[in-house]
Amino acid sequence: AAIAAGHVMGVVEPLDCGVAAGGFMTIHCSSRNKTEVIDFLGTAPASAKYELYAINDINGDYTIRVEGQHNQIGYRSIATPGTLRGFEEGHKKYGSLPMHELIAPAISIAKEGFPISYKGALRMARTAHILATTDACRNLYLKSDNSAPREGEIIQNKDYAYTLEEIAKYGADTFYSGDLARFIVNEIDKNYGFLTKDDLLKYKAIWRKPSHFNYNGLDILTPPPPSSGSLVFSGLEALTLDNKSHSAHQLLAEAMLKMFSK
């Protein structure tokens, strides 16, 4: 169910996830009382060196301004995707249904279209200038005047449906070493990106032990670093303050301060 939902989210929340993304999967097996984590974060291509990004300026805060925002926008910002290898690892060990059945709902939604959510419409409105930087992205998500779709408007993504169909037929290997891999690498190469066929071929998801924290008598388990799971621990620690002498707003502020000041 988690993998099926993950694929659907890649269709309906394309700015947050998808087959070319990455992340973590925390799995608890109740019959074995065991919790495991799969780390499938994207990794930097081997040829993506720090010195290849031209620095505009370094501000007084933690931000570094890169010329053209090439570390965030465009082909030089693309990491080696991990989602499909992560899903594959989880499915091999814990899956019960065939992978193609788990991908089928996402294929159907991408073909038929879906009403964009309030959150999705807001995100696209805020990033319309970025979505307009390539013809493919602009034609898919923006209107003729480069404005973003409004909540409830229908978006179709038939090319993504085709990609998912290929993955359903041939597995994740087509994305990392097959026809899809060749298409991805050719597109990135002609646009001076860093991702190569070797980056895709060598990518592996990693099984990790979860981080463990006890809060109010409960065992909390989250992905370990490099995830932000430790921030959850920090926030929960702040919530152990004397509730009688702190308002809910103050507790929340203290929790967020502790989380993001580390």
Where are these regions (language model features)?
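Serine/threonine-rich low-complexity intrinsically disordered regions
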Residues: 150, 196, 240-247
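Extended, domain-scale alpha-helical bundle/helix-rich regions
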Residues: 228-234, 241-244, 258
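Noncatalytic scaffold domains of N-terminal-nucleophile
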Residues: 3-171, 175-177, 181-227
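Generic N-terminal helix/loop capping motif
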Residues: 8, 12, 238, 259-262
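Internal maturation/activation junctions in enzymes
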Residues: 243-262
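Regular secondary-structure segments
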Residues: 165-168, 240, 260
